[in-house]
Amino acid sequence: VVGTAEAARGGGPMTRLAVLVPGGKGQVGSELAAILDARREDLVHAPGSAELDITDPESARDAVEAFAQAARDAELRPVVINTAAYTAVDAAESDPEGAQRVNVAGPAALAEACRDGGMPLLHVSTDYVFPGDADRPYEPGDDTGPRTVYGRTKLEGERAVLESGARAWIVRTAWVYGAHGGNFVKTMARLAAQRDELSVVDDQIGSPTWAADLARGLLELADPVAAGTGPQQRVLHCTNAGSTSWFEFARAIFAELGLDPNRVNPCTSADYPTRTPRPAYSVLSENAWREAGLTPLRPWQDALGEAFATSGGAFRHRG
């Protein structure tokens, strides 16, 4: 079961939060906004990039200052959860300046604004900061070694956030899918409607992570961070439990769609070359998350089942 701060405290009340979510129209940001809206006692502002450009230091500072004042007026504990990112892995290779602006300059400006405004920051990062050639799940303190522009800029963004001196926690995740935006689940549903058979790589291993579960995990962490407990800075990993290949994940998606999983065939990465190398193994360890007193996310298979049960229409291809 996905944990909440309430569960972590044995059923005690959660801190009433004021949460600013840059990147609020994306996969994770949309889920954060929905959960906080449903809680009703919290204040949430989840602007998209058109409303809040984190790459503009003045825009970031104004947004943080205004939200901090709104939190004070409502007598809520403020926290920023940054989900804004340049996530187009292949496009980043030909647009390194764009990736640098969003993944490095943006988080740096946001972190400096949070530092000066006295607001804690949770910054979402990625498994791509690692080389992707491990034989065991990556721990937060393991050596990084990104092999793509996307991964390099995300790692530089992490460092900029931590070096700002803000109260900041980095949360790395992987293989995210959800009802909003483009993702692997939606791609498989679209291709299933267009082709009799598909070939999907079976030599890349990771942990599929439902955006709604990740959002709940981030909010569980936001509770003590906003309350001022725990260390000033930390790096954690948060994904749904377990691991699989893209091939097996695709088969599971077909099953949820009510289709024959045998329509999906395995292939190697060499059979399906991409412009940018993908990690062969990028499973992230939950040990540090658990040691921080947080509830590990449920197995990826259970999350996928609920994603289809609650948001299935968003994943099914139309037309």
Language-model region placement:
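SDR active-site strand-loop-helix element
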Residues: 22, 47, 83-84, 121-127, ...
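Adenosine-cofactor binding site in Rossmann-like domains, unifying the SAM/SAH pocket
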Residues: 44-63
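NAD(P)H-binding glycine-rich loop region in Rossmannoid oxidoreductase-like domains
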Residues: 57-102, 113-115
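NAD(P)-dependent short-chain dehydrogenase/reductase
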Residues: 160-208, 212-213, 219-220
